[in-house]
Amino acid sequence: MDKNTITGLVLIGILLVGFSFLSRPSEEQIAAQKRYYDSIAVVQQQEEALRAKTEAALANEKEETAADSASLFFSATKGKEAFTTIQNNLVEITLDNKGGRVYSALLKNYMGQDKKPVVLFNGSDASMNFNFYNKKGALQTKDFYFEAVNKTDSSVTMRLAADSASYIDFIYTLKPDNYLMSFVIKATGMDGKLAASTNYVDISWSQRARQIEKGYTYENRLADLTYKYTGDDVDNLSASKDDEKSVSERLDWIAFKNQFFSSVFIAEQDFEKTTVKSKMEKQGSGYIKDYSAEMSTFFDPTGKQPTDMYFYFGPNHYKTLTALDKGREEKWELNNLVYLGWPLIRWINKWITINVFDWLSGWGLSMGIVLLLLTIMVKIVVFPATWKTYMSSAKMRVLKPKIDEINKKYPKQEDAMKKQQEVMGLYSQYGVSPMGGCLPMLLQFPILMALFMFVPSAIELRQQSFLWADDLSTYDAFITFPFHIPFLGNHLSLFCLLMTVTNILNTKYTMQQQDTGAQPQMAAMKWMMYLMPIMFLFVLNDYPSGLNYYYFISTLISVVTMIILRRTTDENKLLTELEAKKKDPKQMKKTGFAARLEAMQKQQEQLAKERANKQNKK
């Protein structure tokens, strides 16, 4: 460092020291500033003291208000949380003394993905509160500690006591071999202590439905909040978006539903003034839906009549749910929790599919074999309709050379009406109806759709393996991608891929079968017919492997049937038979659809000629 730099730094230092000395405040200024800050501190202390006093007053007011309404059960406002378990051979229920509510529900005979018994909910997953009323306000059971009395292995009474002679009992009882739990609310010695004019209890119930199955997308699609109108039909909230509804009608029950399991709350005296909500949960959160319901039901504060209710924590198994109505005059119809399709298809599944499926399952066969046999049986039932559809197409196919001649005769577009009229006349002469295969196809559609609706709801397929699929109730991912493909997901289902391939083959044979030349525009639509199976690959990739397996087997049988019928049908002989019918005078009479269509075409042609003549005269 040179001499000039050192000199400059020294001068700068002297300037800074001198400036600091000259700019310092005087003693009067320092004293005034100290008084100013002291006054601010005093004001702040006063404000803090006032705020603390106000908050304490508000807290005391809240405590006094709560104490006024809860003074009836003052001794129950303090306690230590404890749990009581009741069980039978099917279900284990844990009850919490805080609020006297159901804390958790475990199903012993059904395993989760972790190979442990399925837990429908536990702890903070669910909540339940009952509001009783006295002259001073609401008594919320969630704020009180109940006492467990009269405990057995399968029943317990959770008691909220005002004193030894005045209390409200929540009585829980599990029946043997049953997922149904009786729940009775009964007041004893509360006459005059609860508002006699209030003959109802308000209930708040909520549950976050856990993701129990492997496939979030499909399980979420079949999970919804369902409820049944008293003496009427069943309704539900949307399963695909957040939904809320206020229900003015009386309800028999409300169900928080997963794909294969449900938590159902049933009221013998009905629910009323009900509001139900369902919110979607994010994928990966471990939950699929957040359900909640607020409702009221009958309650007798005098204790003369108990409030009878039930909980059902169990599988969505059709016959299990149906059995709950045995001996009841007013049916709960909880079997509506199992979706079996539209009315006609549901009827087929209810009376035929389920019974045949149970019969085959009783042989102790693999569920994959049961589905195979069931599919074959369905194909046998619909074979007469399949054969009739095929023969109708075969007759039209052997007439294709004659149709081609008509097409050559009328090559111009303006002659389309004449060409169509002559084609229909040809069909009529040979006794062939172009719509002959449509009715049989429509008749077999409900039967084929019945299985399509039944398989995804069949809890019997849950965790049942077959070939490479470890669970027929969810997708079989034989390839898993480290990324997400739009509309496809992060995996590829092998049964879905096989189903797609067989559908393409089926489309090919069907198009060949229907290539009669009568509809040239079909050539432009062929690519759409081949596109449909590709679309199915994206749509059904997340669907249960059991469903894709059924669809694959069903389509494969259709392809094989088509090939066999094609090879065993002598088309020359068929044409000879048609020629013989043409020569038969009885066949010359135009009847049915073809005759009506031909008559309409002639009428349209006549009207067109009349309009043309009028225009020429002008």
UniProtKB/Swiss-Prot annotation:
Its main location: membrane. InterPro entries: Membr_insert_YidC (IPR019998), Membr_insert_YidC_N (IPR028053), YidC/ALB3/OXA1/COX18 (IPR001708), YidC/Oxa/ALB_C (IPR028055), YidC_ALB_C (IPR047196), YidC_periplasmic_sf (IPR038221). GO terms for molecular function: membrane insertase activity. It is found in: Cell inner membrane. It holds the Pfam family 60KD_IMP. Coiled coil: none annotated. The chain crosses the membrane at residues 3-23, 363-383, 439-459, 478-498, 520-540, 545-565. GO terms for cellular component: plasma membrane. Keywords: Cell inner membrane, Cell membrane, Chaperone, Membrane, Protein transport, Transmembrane, Transmembrane helix, Transport. One of its GO terms (biological process) is protein transport. It is a multi-pass membrane protein. Interacts with the Sec translocase complex via SecD. Specifically interacts with transmembrane segments of nascent integral membrane proteins during membrane integration. Required for the insertion and/or proper folding and/or complex formation of integral membrane proteins into the membrane. Involved in integration of membrane proteins that insert both dependently and independently of the Sec translocase complex, as well as at least some lipoproteins. Aids folding of multispanning membrane proteins. Belongs to the OXA1/ALB3/YidC family. Type 1 subfamily. This is Membrane protein insertase YidC. It comes from Bacteroides fragilis (strain ATCC 25285 / DSM 2151 / CCUG 4856 / JCM 11019 / LMG 10263 / NCTC 9343 / Onslow / VPI 2553 / EN-2).
